[in-house]
């Protein structure tokens, strides 16, 4: 990408704060793709905020997003630096799809949007480690805390969604946190008392049981050191899917938006 855009390379060690600070002053925007962000992300954010440099990442780790917001939001505002989290699969499709759906619902309050996710893909080593960390630290109170959440959630348990012909399983991901912050920033689009919930969409009841069991097993395994280490060793950082695997990857999010007098259905889809 730097070669295509004719950009210079700037190299800096994330474990060297002085080097990071000097490098950040030489650019306007830093795009960091090195996860897990709970291990490697904060020094870059800190250096960017101090230098007044914008910082964009691909994190899907709720605890990291919450930590950065609590500790760097006000310093970033003071230094006119933008911190833009979750600009990958987490959470661009969900955030943009919810925004578009809210626009179609028109003016008014009490809007609710549910999204249903179908996807096929392979984790890279870094993404796998980030996901394990996110499951380990996942806290419902942290993500849905009204202090940081805009509106009231209307999560359902596992249920049949007739409008898409699939079963829905709640997703413990960062997307609702990101969507809720967008809603708080754009009250003109989302209105008051906005809610957003996100689910896996699966075709058969047996797949529902498999998805629920899989999530439960991973959450339990991340709390047991020996099992957690086995998960971490499954794939090393820097090891990603092959081109053939990426060519077969896809995602689709279906959004059901409701207001007091209107219901709309939209979708966002794509490949790797």
What are these regions (language model features)?
Residues 41, 59-81:
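Rossmann-fold NAD(P)-binding glycine/threonine-rich loop
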Residues 57, 83-85, 115:
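General beta-strand structural signal in soluble alpha/beta enzymes
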Residues 36, 45-65:
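ADP-ribose/adenylate-binding Rossmann-like module
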Residues 28-29, 54, 264:
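Structural motif
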Residues 62-64, 88-95:
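Gly/Ser/Thr-rich loops at beta-strand to alpha-helix junctions
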Residues 80, 103-272:
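C-terminal catalytic/substrate-binding lobe primarily of soluble NAD(P)-dependent oxidoreductases
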Residues 10-29, 33-40:
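Conserved Rossmann-fold cofactor-binding substructure of NAD(P)-dependent oxidoreductases
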Residues 2-10, 79-81:
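A short helix-to-beta-strand connector/capping loop
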